[in-house]
Amino acid sequence: MRKAIVYASVHHGNTEKLVKGIAEECQVDLIDAVKQPDADLNSYDMIGFASGIYFSKFHQSILEFAEKNLPDDKKIFLICTYGGSANYKTIEQILDKKYSTVIGKFGCKGYDTFGPFKLVGGIAKGHPDEKDIKNAVEFVKGL
């Protein structure tokens, strides 16, 4: 079964750290939505979308990528890193339009210095850590 993870990691590299850890242990292709906005997903059986959470949403590049490039009727898994809380609503709205089946979701804390968090030196320092990466690897292996 061919798997890909389409990701965006634009501020502190939290999501990239997580998906690269997954790729070291699992057979998945990594696609950077910012650098490869036109990547073809047709040959993949299972597709993951991974992003930090920005204003309670996946990064705009992920939302645009899914809207434009995701073929209908695919098995999907979702991964997010966050300072506050996980939120999958906006990406799930796009996936619903594409008749996709979400087979799993994984989220973990990620270092965040946005807005008021910057005043206190950020939150979730050191995350994702080795335990977070191990849990993400186990999540993908279990799909």
List the predicted regions and their residue ranges.
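A short beta-strand-loop structural module common to alpha/beta enzyme folds
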Residues: 27-38
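FMN-binding flavodoxin-like domain, especially the glycine-rich phosphate-binding loop
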Residues: 3-4, 10, 16, 24-29, ...
